[in-house]
């Protein structure tokens, strides 16, 4: 990638010129080929209208977490401290891989024993592609949406697919 300021030949994908330290981040950006790609690259996460976060404190029991997930028909809960800061996420996957056992004593243990601590998050202003990349790279089905460090909501793979499908309906018909 040739620097437009000094003509230095940088490695492809370089963020900064190796010679003059000029910002190169805008030079190697992919261009959208269709409406779906453009939406993923340009639309913010807020476009998905993230569902409101359902939260519990770390001391809530697994039983309470399951009851909340059933009551709100959701696949994941955000675990927040007394100041409202995100400390973890408890998902259906956590329930199946960490809690499920013949030992029912787990039901009254704190959800913090089984949650995924410090989960990956997105901001409402992040691009859909950024969120999708985090989901794909980490194997996540849910991502908390934080604004100023506080949980604002959550997006899911289903939300992404619903958005892409809505764009494709007009692409093919």
Language-model features: locations:
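Tandem CBS (Cystathionine beta-synthase) repeat/Bateman regulatory domains
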Residues: 1-173
């Amino acid at each position: 990638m040739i620097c437009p300021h000094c003509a230095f030949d940088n490695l492809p994908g370089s963020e900064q010129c190796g010679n003059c330290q000029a910002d190169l981040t805008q030079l190697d950006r992919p261009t959208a080929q269709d409406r779906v790609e453009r939406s993923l690259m340009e639309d913010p996460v807020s476009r998905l209208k993230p569902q409101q976060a359902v939260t519990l404190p770390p001391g809530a029991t697994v039983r309470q977490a399951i009851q909340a997930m059933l009551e709100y028909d959701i696949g994941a809960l955000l675990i927040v401290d007394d100041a409202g800061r995100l400390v973890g996420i408890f998902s259906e996957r956590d329930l199946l891989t960490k809690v499920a056992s013949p030992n029912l004593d787990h039901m009254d243990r704190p959800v913090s024993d089984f949650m995924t601590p410090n989960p990956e998050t997105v901001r409402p202003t992040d691009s859909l592609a950024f969120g999708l990349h985090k989901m794909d790279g980490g194997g996540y089905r849910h991502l908390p949406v934080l604004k100023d460090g506080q949980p604002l909501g959550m997006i899911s793979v289903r939300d992404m697919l619903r958005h892409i499908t809505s764009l494709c309906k007009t692409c093919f018909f």
